[in-house]
Design a protein with these regions (language model features):
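C-terminal beta-sandwich interaction modules and adjacent acidic
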Residues: 1-435
Length: 435
């Protein structure tokens, strides 16, 4: 006997903001009659952190041993279950053939943004289940991205230019050199994914050593907080993007201005999450030849979801969502996206909103066929400012994260690949936002 169950989200890029309505369908196909209790759709959103630390202990015999402790924490933001047909105390016969069940859920307004990190994550998913009588339950899962707006225009501090200076002298054989001065400057500290940060770096090398290389890196700093078995924090730092500058000779000064492009990344702070905190900064480093420590300056960066108006070229403000072409509907194999969503790019032949796998007892979770039209543009969440050119919703630069979500059912597929999407803008003058 072959059974199929699929989830189709009406928003093909599976990206939503708090307060949006998630709509979709559960598709079930059975070759023979099935005795079931119900078919359900369960929505959930959670934050989880977990890491393991080791420590050495000496036992009563004076022997040393290594003890491992796992620290963890959990927060739940969304838990909604609906019965699409039947119920826990019912028994119904599902006739052979194909069956489609619609679902709809309104997301709470204050959800934190989706996030994938080394020691923790924030994930949202819908699980469809067919509860069979005297048989294994059949389940399939679909992950989706949730975003929390971070409007840079509402924070006056991120609009201001910032200059940071560091200075040191080098000592060798009781002699002090002239000063080494490193200066970093940006015209603002609030940006969005897709933008280029104009970075000005100045090096005044009054020493007798060469500055072998100068770099500027965008760093992602994450603080994970666990509450079990005790409260503890774990901090990670990753270089996201790096630009380099040429060496600076002894008693030489140089100044450069370069652009550092921001890839698709989650917004700063992860508002409304109490166990994961996210910050970004520019780390400008002068590497000194010889046995000397390097010189650094750091500039905090706020990554938002809505760009500063002052950084949008006037010509691009004319590309309002209302003037963008709508997706074709006549030949599309699926119903058109909801009219309240503006359009956003959708890579052809991708299935970001549906997960699939093959189980052990003849049950298959199969992807719905995707639209074949290369110009089909799916729906995307709306922006609060109609004059801002709409972003695309790009997969996070960190790529695929293997997802294992536990389930009490014996017939659940694990190992789903999940990549959150984040709003990414093209605000360069003379170039239209990608469609």
């Amino acid at each position: 006997m072959v059974r199929q169950i699929r989830i189709y989200l009406d928003n093909p890029i599976a990206t939503y903001y708090g307060g949006d309505t998630v709509t979709g369908k559960v598709f079930v196909k059975v070759d023979d009659e099935e005795k079931i209790r119900y078919i359900s759709a369960k929505f959930r959103g959670d934050a989880n952190v977990s890491w393991t630390e080791s420590d050495s202990e000496t036992d009563s015999d004076g022997k040393s041993r290594t003890v491992y402790t796992t620290y963890s924490a959990h927060e739940n933001y969304l838990m909604t279950k609906m019965y699409l047909v039947g119920g826990p105390s019912q028994e119904i016969i599902l006739p052979p053939g194909e069956h489609i069940y619609n679902f709809s859920v309104i997301l709470p307004e204050n959800l934190p943004s989706s996030f994938e990190g080394i020691n923790g994550n924030i994930r949202y998913m819908v699980r469809a289940k067919m509860n069979r009588v005297w048989a294994f339950d059949d389940t399939v899962k679909a992950f989706f991205t949730v975003l929390s707006h971070l409007d840079l225009n509402k924070d006056p501090l991120v609009k201001e230019p910032v200059t940071t200076v560091a200075e040191k002298t080098l000592c060798c054989c009781c002699c002090r050199s002239g000063p080494l001065t490193l200066v970093g400057n940006v015209p603002a500290v609030g940006f969005v994914s897709g933008q280029e940060i104009p970075v000005t770096v100045e090096v005044d090398n009054g020493t007798n050593e060469t500055i072998s290389i100068v770099t500027c890196s965008l760093k992602k700093n994450v603080c994970f907080t666990a509450h079990s078995p005790s409260t503890r924090t774990n901090k990670t730092s990753e270089k996201v993007e790096t630009i380099t500058f040429e060496p600076v000779g002894e008693n030489e000064s140089k100044t450069w201005t370069k652009q550092l492009k921001i890839p698709s990344l989650p917004p700063s702070t992860l508002k409304n999450c109490g166990i994961i905190d996210l910050e970004y900064c520019l780390d400008i480093k002068a590497e000194i030849s010889g046995p000397h420590t390097n010189l650094h300056v750091n500039i905090p960066i706020t990554l938002g979801t809505i760009p500063l108006f002052t950084y949008i070229p006037p010509g691009l403000l004319q590309n309002t969502p209302e003037k963008l072409p709508l997706p074709p509907t006549a030949s599309a194999p699926y119903p058109p996206p909801p009219s309240q969503f503006p359009t956003a790019p959708y890579p052809a032949n991708t299935a970001a909103d549906i997960t699939s796998g093959t189980s052990q007892l003849g049950f298959s979770n199969v992807l719905l066929p995707l639209p074949s039209q290369s110009n089909l543009t799916p729906s995307a969440p709306p922006l609060p400012y109609p004059d801002i050119p709409p972003p695309s919703y790009e997969e996070c630069m960190y790529g695929t994260s293997n997802v294992n979500v536990g389930d009490n059912a014996s017939h659940t597929e694990e190992g789903y690949n999940h990549v959150p999407r984040y709003p990414t803008y093209n605000l360069r003058p003379g170039e239209a936002t990608r469609m």
